[in-house]
């Protein structure tokens, strides 16, 4: 197993780098990695995963970097350390921007050279002087912009030091990436933050008017942190020993960015442009010729990336939790395994009520066949969860397991909390149990599902807040929606005392901000299954994409059918 050490792992790009590894089950092109994250700040993700080690250290202290590399012996170092902030903040606190970066960059480069470790060095758009387009080879012909004067010199000197080691010692085990204006979910949203982060905070804090600096006419090349992380991995994987810009290929005005965020927020806000404040550089646009040559182009659209960033911040300020009420089906009275018999409710009326709530809905005639596992149930427990690779976990367990020693797997603990005597043995190993549920077996349970339905149903993809998913389904569930909550649920069946463990994601078509502010209660027993205020209405969707029915007798009956 290889090891990667990420400095600056609590920063915007550093967090995406960690999550990229976790999302790929610690793999990069089939190669397993152990991840070591180091920073002088706490990490921004709220779990500690198996295979991930975090050390909170002051990287500016003597011998800290040397000791870390000696301790972990990494195959790859990604230097994502950087200090982000507005041009005003950089001018007012130049030492805070220049000294830490300069010292850390110098030490990391020297230690990676001495150990012959591959280094990905994250530079910055700030190294360039103002011009119509930023070309890699033009950096050393001019001086940096005065708006990035101090931060840019630390990055420039890091690049120059790598070139020096290459010339004098032949050290060429490095890549330099120069991202454009980076933004994303794990940015700093306080005072003095970068333009997108500060605009999001203003929008969320206001109900009528926001004030933005300048006149809105300057243009920027914005890139999403997740795309930057993907490019970093590609540069290492392909051993690109070069300095490469990473831009979007788009030129976006500040005004357009603000307008997009207001639209996504669902708010009706006035914008005051304060022309007494500086515009900053009028244009920042990366030349992406070399980037295209290496096929390192972004994959996430600007608007989708804004939406994900906005959703992260709105979830953060509401304590990362939407107020979902536990739902019940106590009055439905369905018979287990019956296709046609429904007691206690008019069939048509009831199906109309649940049409937008039951996942994998192909035809109404097929509902009853599945309702024994989906409808006459009560949610007993519910936990937010993450799926990465083949593992699923409650956050609490991984927080308690800082060294990656989980102890019991989550379902072993979970079944002790519920009714472990009724859980079949196969659940002791989730992956093995899932392999036993072949496509043919799933088809027996859900006979009208087609191939694409089942492929979506049995995947292990991590869906996060703000992700957009386009399931390959027909009917109500067809289309594009935004995930706002994913949870693990245990249900018991009132008819036979059995139950199931399943995973759902909740998503909406509409703007994310009103959903976070307004969505309040799910109650399937009322006439209107969604209780919320405008504009959410009935745009709620639920998809079950991992489902374990563990009533052994009933699953055997299904097998016999």
Where do the protein language model's features map onto the residues?
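Conserved Rossmann-fold NAD(P)-dependent oxidoreductase catalytic core, especially the SDR/UDP-sugar
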Residues: 106-148, 175
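NAD(P)H-binding glycine-rich loop region in Rossmannoid oxidoreductase-like domains
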Residues: 59-100
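Non-heme Fe(II)/2-oxoglutarate
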Residues: 321-442
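N-terminal Rossmann NAD(P)H-binding glycine-rich loop of SDR-like oxidoreductase domains
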Residues: 2-26
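Flexible, glycine-rich beta-alpha linker
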Residues: 128-129, 149-150, 177-196, 219
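C-terminal substrate-binding subdomain of Rossmann-fold SDR/epimerase-dehydratase oxidoreductases
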Residues: 205-318
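Catalytic core of Fe(II)/2-oxoglutarate
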Residues: 467, 477-480, 489-561
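Active-site Tyr-X1-5-Lys
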Residues: 146-175, 201-206
């Amino acid at each position: 197993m290889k090891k990667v050490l990420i400095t600056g792992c609590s920063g915007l790009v550093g967090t995406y780098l960690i999550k990229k590894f976790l999302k790929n089950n610690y793999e990069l092109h089939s190669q397993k990695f152990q991840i070591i994250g180091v920073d002088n700040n706490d990490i921004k993700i709220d779990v500690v995963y198996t295979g991930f080690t975090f050390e909170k250290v002051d990287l500016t202290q003597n011998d800290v970097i040397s000791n870390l590399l000696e301790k972990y012996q990494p195959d790859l170092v990604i230097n994502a350390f950087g200090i982000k902030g507005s041009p005003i903040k950089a001018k007012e606190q130049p030492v805070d921007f220049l000294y830490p970066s300069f010292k850390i960059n110098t030490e990391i480069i020297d230690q990676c050279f001495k150990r012959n470790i591959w280094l990905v060095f994250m530079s910055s758009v700030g190294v360039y002087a103002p011009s119509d387009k930023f070309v890699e080879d033009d950096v050393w012909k001019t001086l940096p912009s005065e708006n990035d004067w101090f931060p840019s010199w630390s990055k420039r000197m890091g690049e120059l030091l790598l070139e020096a080691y290459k010339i004098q010692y032949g050290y060429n085990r490095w890549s330099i990436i120069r991202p454009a204006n980076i933004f994303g979910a794990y940015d700093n949203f306080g005072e003095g933050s970068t333009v997108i982060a500060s605009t999001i905070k203003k929008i969320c804090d206001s109900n009528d008017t926001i004030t933005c600096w300048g006149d809105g006419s300057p243009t920027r090349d914005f890139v999403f942190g997740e795309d930057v992380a993907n490019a970093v991995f590609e540069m290492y994987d392909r051993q690109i020993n070069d300095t490469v810009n990473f831009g979007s290929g788009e030129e976006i005005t500040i005004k357009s960015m603000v307008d997009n965020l207001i639209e996504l927020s669902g708010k009706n806000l006035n914008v005051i442009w304060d022309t007494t404040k500086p515009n900053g550089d009028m244009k920042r646009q990366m030349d992406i010729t070399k980037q295209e040559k290496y096929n390192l182009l972004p994959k996430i659209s600007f608007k989708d990336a804004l939406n994900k960033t906005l959703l992260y911040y709105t979830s953060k300020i509401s304590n990362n939790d939407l107020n979902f009420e536990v739902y019940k089906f106590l009055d439905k009275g369905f018979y287990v395994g019956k296709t046609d018999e429904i007691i206690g409710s008019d069939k048509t009326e009831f199906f109309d009520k649940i049409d937008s709530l039951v996942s994998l809905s192909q035809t109404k005639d097929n509902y009853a066949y599945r309702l024994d596992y989906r409808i006459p149930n009560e949610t007993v427990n519910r936990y937010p969860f993450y799926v990465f690779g083949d593992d699923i976990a409650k956050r609490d367990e991984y927080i308690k397991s800082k060294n990656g020693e989980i102890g019991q797997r989550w379902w072993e603990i979970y079944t002790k909390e519920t009714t472990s005597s009724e859980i079949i043995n196969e659940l002791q190993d989730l992956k093995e149990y899932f392999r036993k549920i072949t496509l043919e077996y799933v088809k027996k349970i859900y006979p009208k599902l087609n191939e694409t339905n089942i492929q979506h149903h049995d995947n292990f993809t991590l869906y996060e807040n703000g992700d957009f998913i386009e399931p390959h389904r027909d009917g109500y569930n067809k289309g594009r929606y935004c995930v706002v909550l994913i949870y693990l649920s245990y249900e018991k069946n009132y008819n036979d005392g059995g139950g199931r463990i399943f995973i759902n994601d909740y998503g909406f078509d509409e703007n994310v901000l009103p959903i976070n502010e307004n969505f309040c209660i799910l109650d399937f027993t009322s006439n209107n299954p969604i209780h919320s205020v405008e504009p959410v209405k009935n745009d709620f969707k639920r998809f079950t994409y991992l489902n374990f029915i563990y009533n052994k007798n009933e699953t055997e009956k299904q097998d016999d059918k």
